[in-house]
């Protein structure tokens, strides 16, 4: 029912004559600005900023309380704005039914990021279910994208900002914002909604496969058109940049801004300290993170090396009941693989505890295929762990690469390759281990929080100048 209504609404909007549509959108946009003007004036007065210079930036991040790498990007971006642009108030659009105090407390506990709460406004969205995959059982990509357009309109209806930045990958919101407000639009893209890899992966043998390929190509064109509405686009890796450039066009203002990694504290860990023969997998408990194959590869490693003292530690956050069910599924799988005495699961560990794990484990594992970046991998390397990562995406092309001609870790693709890499990493001589740990840590200088804040701030300054030039 929801799918039918959303598609019908989309067709209705497209069917309206473009001139009439623009006129209607412009009129609605003017009303939205007038409606929010008194609220903005009150905010500026409360925080003591000059109204003529004051601006609001809307961060579109419906799952802002998830506690993962994407949320670290969001909150460090907010910190960058608060640090470098004192006249700007950050507006965070969220669908999380959690108080401002609770959200900021989790930000502090999870990421060690302190924010000025007086310069943050949370706008609570009621229609977040429209971007949930569970809402769209068929045509999921299209459904979520149409849903994001409706959710994007709800966002600017509740609070019309001066600048709009999407930090979760909802490119179709750009069309809505430009249609109703025509304000500067920025984006931080973690990964493309559809990629050229996806298009290449589908073999056109059956009729169904051909239909699916036609659907994907049509959607890729829609995605490309939506992305072209952004004024400035940041990507988290060269892999993501290349895909976005091929989809959205090379003429867009596109730059790589590596995500913030809290390396300063981790680099204080004594790299010479004795470590336990433990493999650490630091990742949100979600199916795409491939925890199942981490368990299977570890089980294979033990089949091949039954006397090994190695252990596996899985540490990650959960977003709700669905993720907790996934954790329970993983525990069941670990038991089936006879790993129950060798595997430990940790859920929603506070940052100090994560640092403790990073300081005692030997190997850091990454198993997600084509991961857009891999903040956890950088944290491994900064803390002195030897990374064993997937031979794809950001970990392959940007992170675990030779440093001054010397290796910084291992790459693997299959379960057997991972098992072999675990063995190689665990059986390096003490001198070889130390050299690789030092190389890995040295390579992390490119990914510090201060580097992200500087690079994000440079792009935000362009968006701000564009807004000032329009007034």
From Swiss-Prot:
Membrane-protein topology: Single-pass membrane protein
TM spans (from-to): 4-25
Domain of life: Eukaryota
Cytoplasmic side: 26-138, 160-372, 394-471
Protein purpose: GDP-Man:Man(3)GlcNAc(2)-PP-Dol alpha-1,2-mannosyltransferase that operates in the biosynthetic pathway of dolichol-linked oligosaccharides, the glycan precursors employed in protein asparagine (N)-glycosylation. The assembly of dolichol-linked oligosaccharides begins on the cytosolic side of the endoplasmic reticulum membrane and finishes in its lumen. The sequential addition of sugars to dolichol pyrophosphate produces dolichol-linked oligosaccharides containing fourteen sugars, including two GlcNAcs, nine mannoses and three glucoses.
Entry's family note: Belongs to the glycosyltransferase group 1 family. Glycosyltransferase 4 subfamily.
PANTHER family, A to Z: GDP-MAN:MAN(3)GLCNAC(2)-PP-DOL ALPHA-1,2-MANNOSYLTRANSFERASE
The protein, known as: GDP-Man:Man(3)GlcNAc(2)-PP-Dol alpha-1,2-mannosyltransferase
Source organism of the structure: Schizosaccharomyces pombe (strain 972 / ATCC 24843) (Fission yeast)
